[in-house]
């Protein structure tokens, strides 16, 4: 297996290689076709393709000259807006290479910039608008000031669907000569919830421990409980077999080394999938949230887990 990070090794390099995101690809293809585009803001959760799509757009716009015409910056890495200003100024003062009418600046983690820095960024975008376009990347649109939002076309990136993530993981596993079970693929998706970067990294971590990846291999590699085992344990608790459930959970923590907060997070996911009336689910979520908060505050995690399971069983009995 290659030592290169698989997420980088298998990063798409064209629109056709990008899984899902059909609406986004359609809009960006129109910009490429017209040879012009506005400033853009890509926003959405981590691992949903924002950086990848920005780089694909650069390749599609500039072809072999995409590196010469593209400047990548990270707002959290740079030493301040003055550094960004100087780098953009130096980059924008020369003409684009090839036939492109403008150069491209990709600014990641733009929502981590202060309001003052974003105001300065807005002025930079206006000064160099004649021959430079900006793509701002952000996890949270609420972190971007309104004066910038009004000057860009905003494109939302949603968590990737399970089918798209699992298909990509299976493709990578085949290319790397790794055997992986369907249950293992499902477990990786459960752990990563539509974050493609996190999913591919999880696959690589699991593959580094075993050539044949099962659900249990994934769980051990990622420091989580096998979803199958957790569901079985939850069912024991809901049936009133607390002694058995407590023994199993104790084993997950002490013998398996799984963190109590991780177990609480997994219980939260499983509980909300129970076949119960919808009006009950907010109360279930609240019970789990209380246990999570108390554990974060220093309470003993196992005690919080056992207490939450008892409350959940009592609530579900009342709802029947």
Swiss-Prot record:
Keywords: ATP-binding, DNA replication, Nucleotide-binding. GO terms for molecular function: ATP binding; ATP hydrolysis activity; DNA binding; DNA clamp loader activity. Disulfide bonds: none annotated. ATP binds at residues 44-51. GO terms for cellular component: DNA replication factor C complex. Pfam families: AAA (PF00004), AAA_lid_RFC1 (PF25361), Rep_fac_C (PF08542). GO terms for biological process: DNA repair; DNA-templated DNA replication. It comes from the Archaea. The keyword Nucleotide-binding applies. Part of the RFC clamp loader complex which loads the PCNA sliding clamp onto DNA. Heteromultimer composed of small subunits (RfcS) and large subunits (RfcL). Belongs to the activator 1 small subunits family. RfcS subfamily. This is Replication factor C small subunit 2.
């Amino acid at each position: 297996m290659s030592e290169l990070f698989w997420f980088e090794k298998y990063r798409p390099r064209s629109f056709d290689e990008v899984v899902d995101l059909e609406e986004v690809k359609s809009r960006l293809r129109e910009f490429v076709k017209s040879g012009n585009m506005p400033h853009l803001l890509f926003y959405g959760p981590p691992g949903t393709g924002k950086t990848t799509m920005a780089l694909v757009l650069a390749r599609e716009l500039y072809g072999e000259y995409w590196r010469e015409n593209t400047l990548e910056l990270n707002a959290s890495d740079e030493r301040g807006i003055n550094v960004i200003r100087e780098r953009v100024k130096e980059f924008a003062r020369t003409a684009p290479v090839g036939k492109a009418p403008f150069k491209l600046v990709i600014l990641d983690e733009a929502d981590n910039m202060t309001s003052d820095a974003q105001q300065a960024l807005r002025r930079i975008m206006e000064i160099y608008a004649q021959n430079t376009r900006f793509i701002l990347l952000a996890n949270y649109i609420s972190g971007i000031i309104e004066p910038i939002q009004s000057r860009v076309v905003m494109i939302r990136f949603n968590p990737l669907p399970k089918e798209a993530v699992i298909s990509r993981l299976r493709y990578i596993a085949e290319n790397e000569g790794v055997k992986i079970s369907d249950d293992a693929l499902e477990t990786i998706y459960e752990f990563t919830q539509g974050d493609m970067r996190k999913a591919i990294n999880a696959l690589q971590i699991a593959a580094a421990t075993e050539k044949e990846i099962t659900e249990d291999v994934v769980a051990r590699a990622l420091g989580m409980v096998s979803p199958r085992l957790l569901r079985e344990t939850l069912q024991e608790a809901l049936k009133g077999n607390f002694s058995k459930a407590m023994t199993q959970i104790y084993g997950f923590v002490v013998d398996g080394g799984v963190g109590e907060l991780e177990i609480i997070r997994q219980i939260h996911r499983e509980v909300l999938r129970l076949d119960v009336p919808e009006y009950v689910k907010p109360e279930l979520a609240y019970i789990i949230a209380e246990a999570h908060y108390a554990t974060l505050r220093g309470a003993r995690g196992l005690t919080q887990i056992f207490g939450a399971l008892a409350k959940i069983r009592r609530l579900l009995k009342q709802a029947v």
